[in-house]
Curated annotation (Swiss-Prot):
MF (Gene Ontology): ATP binding; ATP hydrolysis activity; ATPase-coupled intramembrane lipid transporter activity; magnesium ion binding
Keyword field contains Translocase: yes
Membrane topology classification: Multi-pass membrane protein
Species of provenance: Mus musculus (Mouse)
Chief location of this protein within or outside the cell: Golgi
Record region (Disordered): 508-535
Protein name: Probable phospholipid-transporting ATPase IIB
Catalytic function, reaction form: ATP + H2O + phospholipidSide 1 = ADP + phosphate + phospholipidSide 2
Coiled-coil residues: none
EC code: 7.6.2.1
Protein family membership: Belongs to the cation transport ATPase (P-type) (TC 3.A.3) family. Type IV subfamily.
Length: 1146
């Protein structure tokens, strides 16, 4: 301990130090640490601070550079917060008291309440409920134009151009034709309005289609057709197979004999697995549909809420004696936007419209703004400052003669092209082109660009945060190991298990029908077989049976209809053929376990709400009654089932779950923890399986308490959990299972490529530490020669203090930390932990919750100011994906929720390499070149205007008017400039082969103040050469200076585009010649625009003049002088200091 460098200097722990600490913490108030304590719900550790005095006086930090200087930071933060409370407290009080009333009056948001819904009687509803209409439109007929204009003019630049355009209606400020300013602005607005109108019309059509869908409504007089938008709370709605459920309903009846049905929820939660739903038993037992109106029944439903995975309610039938009460849970609900997958269902509507779960969970994601857009915005502000400075300089040199303020405003108008209005249009069109290229890339099929505004972010990433299961791995589970405590079975010894199972059930089959199958192996122990072998055989039999029974898997059988060719689902007891059977479950782990029991001889052939059937190797079908089912939850991390063997009437409670949840439930053993660690180090996902045999009296007592808890309206979940926990005691440990999730194709080379590109990779997973570490090594996220620092579990501030010090002394090692330790460290040492973790080549966070994943992303963005990317495939990754600067979703076996919420969607992890190295890199470099060239285009013409005005005694007279100004940024130069989106410095194959090229992009050298200043100097040089050249060489033909300078300007811009291009595309050549042709053709039609001061001088362009040799060689000379030096400088730079890509492209 003596050689450790403490995070805070440790001094004597005397009474004075304790007093200072107490004073410090008492005065600190509810600072940031208090906020974090509330967020993470951790216990206060202040009582233990005497063990390790962490915060001392400021003197303790002197001359100790190794210590973190968080005490001054804490004091500054405390003082700032105190000042904020003093200044803002009164203001907030006034605003709250004065504005709350106004807000309440304006909004009057309806309070959501619990409700009582009578079956088939909408008129009995006590309150008015929203219409069941879907409305995704942003505007209506009256708000469309004002809304779109507001969205555009809330940005400073657009508002600036509007003010400039409106100024031309003032005669004293008018400096040209109105359309010179209104045409570009109108074009931008027209494009935006057209795009919004198309999107709005598509939304309107989709809404109309959904709201007009017809459903059968059950009434006293029979079935009637009703539109989805006309459905009300209390209606009884019939939904056919493959039909969308129109509103949130309670499941009353189904045509399926089992009283249950399957629904698809991929449009609600993104999960592709079917969900089993159960009808209310009271209404399912009714003989006919019409009997629903002959009973007096109602549903009590909780108030509408966001959580799609929970529901609390009751079903009550009043006309029976005594009244029937049934508890309702999530399995009795049919949420809107889900699809009925089997049978026909009847439900009573409980929530409609904006109160449905699907609508309440629909929110507009935060609009992500790319770093390049922010950088261009800063440069635009610099241009605006240059505009103001230049105008002031011109007025100053004019001597403030006359109405100088009017001249100042006129100069602002003359030089307004310094800020290019076409910049945003060009960049938006470029982003659309990049998205199209990404989706058309045959090397990454299935890639979808869902956010077209940030493709350049793919080229600036520094941190990549990835999920493990389904992202780095295939999410295809294969059963690999079964451990019984004394013996372990792997893939090469599975035939032994199959032999044990076969012998066990053959022995059972030879016994009388009343024989207990579970005791068969024990009775065999009386034979001549050694005792150990019989014991192992018995344990194998019990373990396999437990795995085959404890799950939520349902076998589904498909049969081909002869005439229609449609697929229908038959009853399971009609056909047990293996080739027709598929399994449906909420988790691929469940399916893997059931498939394994099938491979060793015990097959799940049928399952409904009340029973489950298993087929033994001898062909005998065993039936088990399902008494209770306890589904898996992320909080409990386990699931259980109580079954009764019909042949023996034996009641057994089976349970399986994660080792952390099961270790305190099972009986004492000395092997579980060790073997879980061993399997995890092999990269296996482990599950602990246990059982407990119940007597009839024990079960009846439990069932009564459980039913009572399920009928509770308040704190139902807590009461139910407490009852279930009463059974989870001293359970018999049966086995430990290991399932392997194999790596996706090309994960290793992809991760290596990303590391070589300078991207730091963090793996955030909910799996256990050993498994996460093993996957990190096998995927080469952490190289085998690299040290790994496993952050030991910490629960207090002092432990976190010591562990951070230990970690701080290590260099170039990967960090592995658990979610619990992460919470503690972030509570006390947020900045320090992030600072240290960012220095690691790789970080693995295990046992992470979805909230923690998103918080880690947010911390990285705030502390590093670097661009982050999150990639995942499941619903638990959505918050992380949305929190990152760039979110990538993978369409995997866990569904499409992550893919739909992401900015980019891919089908395999290996596609991220090409997405970043090729498309991300090209998008950033192209947009950087395009943005700077568009600004250059405005700067050069403004420079020429400044020279022109200075020559004419600083007069605020426009050099170019009318169509020349409109055409300059459109038909004359738009196509060549926009063709820069096709440019590339290296071939895609070279960019992938040398990912080090990507590392240069993170420095932002393609678009920086340095490159911006270079383009400013180029613009000033070229603008001055063009204008002074035109004035000097054409002294005798001075009236033609507009035509001369403008022609040289267009040629210069075309040559500059050619000079900027690094790889020619045939469309670039077409764009160059097309623009040149348009300009030459316009000379014959726009001759009135080519005279200087047409009204004053009366000069027009002589067509014969531009065909003379003198005109041509002088224009050519001016153009060459403006471009040749730049080409020479570029050539010398590439020879003397070549960029990295030039060595590969040569």
């Amino acid at each position: 301990m003596a050689d450790q460098i403490p995070l805070y200097p440790v001094r004597s722990a005397g009474a004075a130090a304790s007093h200072r600490r107490a004073a410090y913490y008492s005065s600190a108030g509810p600072g940031p640490g208090a906020d974090r304590r509330g967020r993470y719900q951790l216990e206060d550790e202040s009582a233990h601070l005497d063990e390790m005095p962490l915060m001392m006086s400021e003197e303790g930090f002197e001359n100790d550079e190794s210590d973190y200087h968080t005490l001054p930071r804490a004091r500054i933060t405390r003082r700032k917060r105190g000042l904020e409370w003093f200044v803002c407290g009164g203001w907030k009080f006034l605003c709250t008291s004065c504005c709350d009333w106004l807000i309440n009056v304006c909004q009057r948001k309806k309070e959501l309440k619990a409700r009582t819904v009578w079956l088939g009687c909408p008129e009995k509803c006590e309150e008015k409920h929203p219409r069941n209409s879907i409305k995704n439109q942003k505007y209506n007929v009256f708000t469309f134009i004002p809304g779109v204009l507001y969205e555009q003019f809330k940005f400073f630049l657009n508002l600036y151009f509007l003010v400039v355009s409106c100024s031309q209606f003032v005669p004293a400020l008018k400096i040209g034709y109105l359309y010179t300013y209104w045409a570009p602005l109108g074009f931008v607005l027209a494009v935006t309005i057209a795009r919004e109108a198309i999107d709005e019309f598509r939304r309107f059509q989709r809404d109309k289609e959904m709201n007009s869908q017809l459903y059968s409504k059950l009434t006293v007089r029979g079935k009637v057709q009703v539109k989805s938008s006309d459905i009300q709370v209390g209606d009884l709605i019939i939904v056919e197979k493959n039909q969308r459920i129109p509103s949130d309903m309670v499941f009353l009846r189904t045509s399926e004999k089992a009283g249950s049905c399957f629904i698809r929820t991929d449009q609600l939660d993104g999960e592709t697995d079917w969900k089993l739903k159960v009808a209310v038993s009271c209404t399912q037992r009714l003989p006919a549909l019409g009997d629903l109106f002959s009973i007096s029944a109602y549903v009590y439903a909780q108030k509408p809420q966001l959580d799609i995975h929970s529901f609390e309610g009751t079903f009550t039938r009043e006309d029976s004696d005594p009244p029937i009460h049934e508890s309702l849970s999530i399995e009795n609900t049919l949420w809107a936007s889900t699809i009925v997958a089997s049978g026909t269902v009847i439900g009573v509507v409980i929530y409609t419209g904006k109160e449905t779960r699907s609508v309440m969970n629909t929110s507009n994601p935060n609009n992500k703004v790319g770093l390049l857009d922010l950088e261009l915005n800063q440069l635009t502000k610099a241009l605006f400052l240059a505009l103001v400075v230049l105008s002031v300089v011109m007025v100053t040199l004019q001597g403030f003669a006359g109405p100088w303020y009017r001249n100042l405003f006129r100069f602002l108008l003359l030089f307004s092209y310094i800020i290019p209005i076409s910049l945003r249009v060009n960049l938006d069109m470029g982003k659309a082109a990049y998205g199209w290229m990404i989706m058309k890339d045959e090397n990454i099929p299935g890639t979808v660009v869902r956010t077209s505004t940030i493709p350049e972010e793919l080229g600036r990433l520094v941190y990549l945060l990835t999920d493990k299961t389904g992202t780095l791995t295939q999410n295809e589970m294969v059963f690999k190991r079964l451990h019984l405590g004394t013996v372990s079975y792997g893939t090469d010894t599975m035939d032994e298990i199959q032999s044990h199972v076969l012998n066990s059930y053959l022995q059972v089959h030879s016994q009388p029908s009343g024989h207990n199958p579970s005791s068969a192996p024990l009775r065999r122990s009386q034979s001549s077989t050694p005792k150990v072998k019989k014991s192992v055989s018995s344990r194998i039999h019990e373990a396999v049976k437990a795995i085959a029974l404890c799950h939520n898997v349902t076998p589904v059988y498909e049969a081909r209809a002869g005439i229609t060719g449609e697929t229908e689902f038959a009853e399971a007891d009609q056909d047990f053929s293996d080739e027709n059977r598929t399994y449906q479950a909420s988790s691929p782990d469940e399916v893997a376990l059931v498939r394994w029991t099938e491979s060793v001889g015990l097959t799940l052939v049928s399952r409904d709400l009340a029973s489950m059937q298993l087929k033994t190797p001898s062909g005998q079908v065993l039936t088990y009654c399902i008494l209770q089912m306890f589904p898996f939850t992320s909080e409990s991390k386990r699931m259980g089932i109580i079954v009764r063997d019909e042949s023996t009437a034996e009641i057994t409670f089976y349970m399986k779950g994660a080792d952390v949840a099961m270790s305190t439930i099972v009986q004492y053993n000395d092997w579980l923890e060790e073997e879980c660690g061993n399997m995890a180090r092999e990269g296996l996902r482990t599950l602990v399986v246990a059982k407990r045999t119940l007597t009839e009296e024990q079960y009846q007592d439990f069932e009564s308490r459980y039913s009572q808890a399920k009928l509770s309206i308040h704190d139902r979940a807590l009461k139910v959990a407490a009852v279930v926990e009463s059974l989870e005691r001293e359970m018999e440990l049966l086995c430990l299972t290991g399932v392997e999730d194999q790596l996706q194709a090309d994960v290793r080379p992809t991760l290596e490529m990303l590391r070589n590109a300078g991207i730091k990779i963090w793996m955030l997973t909910g799996d256990k530490l050993e498994t996460a570490t093993c996957i990190a090594k096998s995927s080469h996220l952490v190289s085998r020669t690299q040290d790994i620092h496993v952050f030991r579990p910490v629960t207090s501030r002092g432990e976190a203090h010591l562990e951070l010090n230990a970690f701080r002394r290590k260099h170039d090692c990967a960090l592995v930390i658990s979610g619990d330790s992460l919470e503690v460290c972030l509570r006390y040492y947020e900045h320090e932990l992030v600072e240290l973790a960012c220095q690691c080549p790789a970080v693995v966070c295990c046992r992470c919750s979805p909230t923690q994943k998103a918080h880690i992303v947010t911390l990285l963005r705030q502390h590093t100011r670097k661009r982050t990317c999150a990639i995942g495939d499941g619903g638990n990754d959505v918050s992380m994906i949305q929190a990152a600067d760039c979110g990538i979703g993978i369409e995997g076996k866990e569904g499409k929720q992550a893919s739909l919420a992401a900015d980019f969607s891919i089908t395999q992890f290996r596609h991220i390499g090409r997405l970043l190295m090729v498309h991300g890199r090209n998008s950033y470099k192209r947009s950087a070149a395009l943005g700077q060239f568009v600004m250059h285009r405005g700067l050069i013409i403004s420079t020429m205007q400044a020279v022109f005005s200075s020559v004419f005694y600083f007069a605020s007279v426009p050099l170019y008017q009318g169509f020349l100004m409109v055409g300059y940024a459109t038909i004359y130069t738009m196509f060549p400039v926009f063709s820069l989106v096709l440019d590339q410095d290296v071939k895609p194959e070279m960019a992938i082969l040398y990912p080090e090229l990507y590392k240069d992009l993170t420095k932002g050298r393609s678009l920086s103040f340095k490159t911006f200043l270079i383009w400013v100097l180029i613009s000033i040089y070229q603008g001055g050469i063009l204008m002074y050249g035109a004035l000097l060489l054409f002294e005798d033909e001075f009236v033609h200076v507009v035509a001369i300078s403008f022609t040289a300007l267009i040629l210069t811009e075309l040559l500059m585009v050619a000079l900027t291009i690094r790889t020619w595309h045939w469309l670039m050549v077409v764009a160059e010649f097309l623009s040149l042709g348009c300009y030459v053709a316009s000379l014959a039609f726009l001759n009135e625009y080519f005279g200087i001061g047409r009204v004053s001088f009366g000069a027009f362009l002589d067509v014969a003049f531009i065909t003379t040799v003198t005109f041509l060689w002088k224009v050519s000379a001016i153009t060459v002088v403006s471009c040749l030096p730049l080409y020479v400088l570029k050539y010398l730079k590439r020879k003397l200091s070549p960029p990295s890509y030039s060595k590969l492209s040569s």
